[in-house]
Structures are given as C-alpha cells and as structure tokens.
Amino acid sequence: MLDTKYPEIIPGPPKPSAILQPRVFSLPPGTERYVVPGAGAILLRLETGDRIEIENTEGGQPCEIVCADLLGGFDAGLIGARAQGAPSGLMALLTSDDPSLRGLRMGIEARGLNLSQAGAVHLFEHSTPAGTTESFTASREGIVIIAAPGGIMDFQAQDTATPLTVFIRRAVLKSAARFELPDPLADPVADIRVHSATAEAYFVKAGDYIQILDVDGRQCTDFQCFAARKLDKGIAHALDVTTTRTLMGHAYPMPGLHAKYYDQEMQPLVEVIQDTCGRHDAFALACAAKYYDDIGYPGHINCSDNFNAALAPHGVAGRAGWMAINFFFNTGLDDHGVMYADEPWSRPGDYVLLRALTDLVCVSSACPDDTSAANGWNPTDIHVRTYSGKETFQRAVAYRPTPDAEPKMTKQTGFHDRFARFTENFIEYNGFWLANCMSTAGPIEEYHACREKCVVLDLSALRKFEITGPDSEALCQYIFTRNMKTLPVGGVVYTAMCYPHGGMIDDGTVFRLGKDNFRWIGGSDYGGEWIREKAAELGLKVLVRSSTDMQHNIAVQGPESRELLKKVIWTAPHQPKFEELGWFRFAPARIGDDQGVPVVVSRTGYTGELGYEIFCHPKHAGAVFDAVWEAGQAHGIRPMGLEALDMVRIEAGLIFAGYDFSDQTDPFEAGIGFTVPLKSKPDDFIGREALIRRKEHPARVLVGLDIDSNVDVGHGDCVHIGRAQIGEVTSSMRSPILGKNIALARVDVAHHEVGTRVEIGKLDGHQKRLPATIVPFAHYDPQKTRPRS
C-alpha cells in the first residue's frame, strides 16, 4: 500500500523578522527624544498633558529649566514645579558665541522673552549618578528651555559639562506624520513640502541655501538643477553626476574641499555645505517607467515622469529617464561590479544643505518606490527649505558616536583659526575639522620639521573622559589592561582596553590626577560608553563623564620641543619644573607665569620624537597657540597636519585604530603586547582569560616590511608567499629618512620571522606583486631613545 502519512511541516504561523534598529525608529508613537549638549540648551514646545522626562545621561550634570506660557509669562507651575532661583547658568551660556545656540537665541527673541525676569527649576547635583531621571507633566500649553550649564573646566576639579537626554511623551499625537519636522536652521525664504510620490520645482537665487530634509527617515529624493541663465537661452544643461565624479574624484561630493556639483560644461551649480546622512547615490538614473515595467509593475508612478511634469512649465523637455543625485539612496558596487541597493541610512530629520553657485531652477522628488527597500518599503514625504545667502552656515557632516546617538555636526577646534592661516585643507576626523596638510609647506617639509626641529599639530579630536569617585581605581584596574595601582599621581600610562574575547576596543593613555581621579584619553567615544556601562553593571561608586569639548589640545613634537616650551610653560612650586617632566608624566601648568592661561602639559606624543601635549579650554586655545608659535620661531617650528603625522607614526611603529587594530585584533597581534602584564598585574581585568589563551596560541603577528619598490602600498593590500595569502598590510608610507618604502603588516605566525621574503599583491593580488622583506618592528628608533631623551 502507498504510504499515506502526511509530510513533516514547519509548524505554526510565520514569525516577523527580528530586526534591531536605532532607537529613534523604535520609540512608541508620540514619543520624542532630544539631547541637550553639555554647556548647551534647547527650547521645546509643550501642550496640555504632555509628559517630559529628563535623564542625567552621564551623571553629575546640573540642569536648569525655564518655563513660559504662550503669552511669554514665566511660570514653573506649567510643569507642576517651583522656581528656585535665577537661570544663571542658562544666561551665561547665551552670552557665549557658540553657534550651536543660534536656534535657541532665535526662539527666545521671536517670543520676546526676557530671561532676566525668569525663575528656573534646578535639578541634579554634581554627584548625581548616571541615568537618574526627573519627570514632569504640562498643565497647559507653553515652552520649556532646558539647559545643561557649564563653564571653563577646571582640569584638576574635572568639572566638565555633559549631556542631558529629554523624552517627551505627547498626550495627543500632533498629526498623522510619525515624526515632526525639525526647526529651521534660520528664517526660511521658502518652505516646500514634496508629498510622497510627487516632485516639486522651485527657483533659488545665487548664494542662497537649499535644505533637503528626509521627514520620516529612510526616504530617497532625486535632486536636479539647471543654471537659470542657460534655461533662459533654451539650454537645459542639468547637473551631471559623471562630470561631477570626474572633477571631484569622489563617488559624490561631501562638505569640504570636494563639495561641488557641475553640469556637463563643468560649470559649478551647487556646493554641499552640510550633510547629516553621508550616504547617497550618484550612479543610477532617477527611477523611470522602464524600470517598473521591467520588474512587473507597468504604469507605476516614477520620479522621471514626475520630474517631467514639474519641469515642463520651465521649458525643460521631458526625458525617459533623468540623471540626478539621489540623496539618501543607499547604493554601492560590490567586488564583482554588481550595483546593489538597500535601505537608506537617513534618520528622521536628516538633511543635505546646498549653496546655489548661480541662479537655479531646481526640482526635488519624494521617490515612490514601494517595490524594494529603497525607501524602507514605505515611501514618505520630503521637505525643502531655502535660506537667504546672508545667513552663515559652517561646513559640517553629522557624526554619531553610536547608532542610537543624536547627530553631532562637525566642529572647529579651538585651534582651527590658527591653523587656517596656513591651509584650507581640512578633513573631517571624528566630528572635528583637522588640518590635513599645510598649503604653505606640505607633508614632506612638515615631516622633516618634526624629525629635525619641532612642529605643532592639532589633536583636539582625541576623546577625553573624567573618571572620578571612590571606586575609580578599582574600575580602571578592571577596564584597562595595564596595572593602575602602580600609576602615581602625575603619571601617564599607555594601555589597551579589551572586550571579553580579547579584541581591542581602543588604545590610549590614562592620566592619574589624584587618589580617586583619572582621565582616559583615547580615539573613540565608545571607549567612554563602555567604561560607563561597566561601572553601572558593577554598581561602582564612580562617574564617567565626557570632557572632549572642554579640553582641546595641541602636540608640540620634535628634538627642540623641550627648549621651546621651557620659554612658555610655568609650573607651580609644588609641581615639577617643566624641564624636569619625565617621559609619560604630566603637570598642571600655566602659559607664561602664574597669571597665565591654565593648561595641562604632558610628556607624551604620537610621533616617535621627544614631544609634549598641551591641553586647554577651547576659549584659551588661541592664546596657547600664539605663545607656542612665537617662542617656536627661534626653533624652526612648523605647523603639521594629519598626513605628515601618519608618516612619522608609521615609521615609529605607533598603531592606529581601524588600520593596525580592530575589535578582532588583540594587543599582541597589534604589536603592543607590553600593555598586557599577565604575570605582574595582581587583579583580574576584562579579557584576561582570552588574552592568556591568545598569547599561548598566537595566530597573527604585526611585523615591519621593507619593500623593494617605490610603488605605493595601501592599507588592506594582501601579503603573499607564492599563491597563498599569509597576511595584509595595515599601514604604509615612503620614508624620507630611511630612503625606502616601508609598511606595517599583520601576518600568519608561521611566517613572521625576520628576513622572510614575501610579496605584496596589487591589482587583483596576483597580476602585480611587490617583493618585500620582513624586518624588525619598528623601523625608526625601535628602542624609543628619542622620546626618552
């Protein structure tokens, strides 16, 4: 008989896809999140019944709240609270010239508020634990101003200013839209809503600004423009992405030096000033009828037809498919040359800010594609605002320390104006504009000045965190690989910080300011997040607060740096004299004399030379730089940028995150095994067991390479013995002093012996090879005699 048994099946109904997304997309409807930056403030509108919750994100940050009704009357009772004094912290902030407070000033002026007559609700103390919250409910409509006051940080008191997080839970949803439109950057000239699956054309004068906003996030928008004068002559030369890519040398322009879009005659049309997303498409056409026809959706509405309809009144002939820059469209080319697309990176409120370089006729669409992930499977609206050319907007991109973080726009360091005297070549690095090289010299001259005389460079983008409290030493001992119990007050130690599996989170330095006072200086914001998370998990009595914006720093490096700074740095009698400062030691100091600008000076650096770093509040940066620069004239001082810094650090074998190590690399594989005292450190630390295993059974080793060729080698180039790949290049440079091409590479432990001959693969890794030899690490002064001198 036939077997009549039913086949096995997968039981039950289907389950939804498990997708983890940034918190902004998972907030319940009617809930909004805002961040008040340290030493900053925001203005928010409240309606009856709205609930507001304020979180002391990092701990220890006081808060001031000013409430006003719709008539401008101040009343803390609007949120059921009582005023406890004047908003002195808020008023002090508003006297500063901080551009981030521009929108707040506009809001206060527009409402005619006189803060000198206001009372403030004061929340939190300097000892308030991280994560502490206070909640209020609005009894009627009005506005609240929430401030996180902060002044010039005392480096020894470590009284930094840190963010507050604000949640508003609306009693009544304002509209059908999930997300509200952010406030304008200035007074708009035009406010244009581009509804889903439509396009709008608009005119923009030369010099004016165009802000293109993604209202709800994950929404693409094609943008096209024409020089109005050409259109008047019947010439419809549109923005040409092929010409633009060729002239800019980038997939698409970004704020900075490579920021302009051109037409086919190479006339610049617009310049990118700000970009909070950083992911766009300049390869594919705007979606067209043929695309939908070919995938089985004939008659589907499309951006090209919408462009044709919007541009027809301006005398522009229709096209079957429009070339465009598709803002927020997430595309790329894989290793096989296949173009792919996925959900956009854009969040609600993300935008691109352009400046018109000539009178323009523009058109913007809200892409209708609901057949793919191009719009997150849910097409929504786009919004366009234009602003007068009389407004001033700094060039910036958005930086998010973590996926859940609110965007931070690129900042200028306190030293920016001083370096801008020598160059316009600044690059975005970790949320700051830093000089790449000097137009007055160039990286080779800067390199030689560092090796032979002295240089000054801006390293303000380094992340600083204040670790304070009775359990601070215990926390540092557990978090960092080095032994913090042996670190004296006034001492600095270079260390790694690892995950439990032994992979590195970051490398950096720890300063000990007191018995219970430490400062971590590393390369990433996440290092501080990790330290704070561990403190909370362990229940330790310690605060971990960011101070990056309170401490900007220059490095003065080179053989003559000590003689130079002897003329500049004053230390108190109970501190070591500057010239007595030992390697990896620091001291609070002042510029010039006991009345000078307060600084912290450390004998540390990232060049392989004798050198120092000077930390100060951004407001004092100009005075610090000027004093160093003036004293340095007799010592041949030169400004140095990141390009030359990369050269000297590679020669000296100093590692760089993202190149020489990652979270898949342990300190031994990164060449800094000396930071892991497995036998001498008496206490456990995160990653110890994994590091013991990795040390006893190594897989890869960081080595030096001497390359028998002047052909440039790059990060990620493969290293071979015969057909087999045995490693990859992590960093490389052409050494002026050594007179050869050198590199750092991570190779299999089976082939790491000095003298081993290898080949570096170019092109596809096989068609072109560069012979090289494994040499001792590091190439330049491996015993570090120069920084010790």
Curated annotation (Swiss-Prot):
UniProt enzyme class: lyase
EC number: 4.1.2.32
Knockout mutant characteristics: Disruption mutant cannot grow on TMAO or its upstream precursor trimethylamine (TMA) as a sole nitrogen source, although it can grow on dimethylamine (DMA) and monomethylamine (MMA).
Record keyword Acetylation present: no
Reaction equation(s) it catalyzes: trimethylamine N-oxide + H(+) = dimethylamine + formaldehyde
Superkingdom as given in the UniProt entry: Bacteria
One annotated Gene Ontology cellular component of this protein: cytosol
Record flagged with keyword Lyase: yes
Entries under Pfam families matching the protein: DUF1989, GCV_T, GCV_T_C
Keywords for this protein: Lyase
GO molecular function: lyase activity
PANTHER family per UniProt: AMINOMETHYLTRANSFERASE, AMINOMETHYLTRANSFERASE, MITOCHONDRIAL
The family this protein is said to belong to: In the C-terminal section; belongs to the GcvT family.
Protein purpose: Catalyzes the conversion of trimethylamine N-oxide (TMAO) to dimethylamine (DMA) and formaldehyde.
Name of the protein: Trimethylamine-oxide aldolase
Native species: Ruegeria pomeroyi (strain ATCC 700808 / DSM 15171 / DSS-3)
Gene name of the encoded protein: tdm
